[in-house]
UniProtKB/Swiss-Prot annotation:
The modification D-tryptophan is found at residue 58. Residues 24-43 are annotated as: Disordered. GO terms for cellular component: extracellular region. This is Contryphan-Lt. Keywords: Amidation, D-amino acid, Disulfide bond, Hydroxylation, Ion channel impairing toxin, Neurotoxin, Secreted, Signal, Toxin. Coiled coil: none annotated.
Amino acid sequence: MGKLTILLLVAAALLSTQVMVQGGGDQPAARNAVPRDDNPDGMSGQFMNVLRRSGCPWEPWCG
């Protein structure tokens, strides 16, 4: 039981240090920032972009 407790404490310490190193917290958005439209063509455009990036198996359909 004691070994399990120590193992859990070490795992928690490692995870917390990893979060502290990688984290940095959420940075507040700039006041003048304009939201970027990542998907201007809607769902169909997003689907076609995925097909183009992954290599569409049927070229006439992909455009």
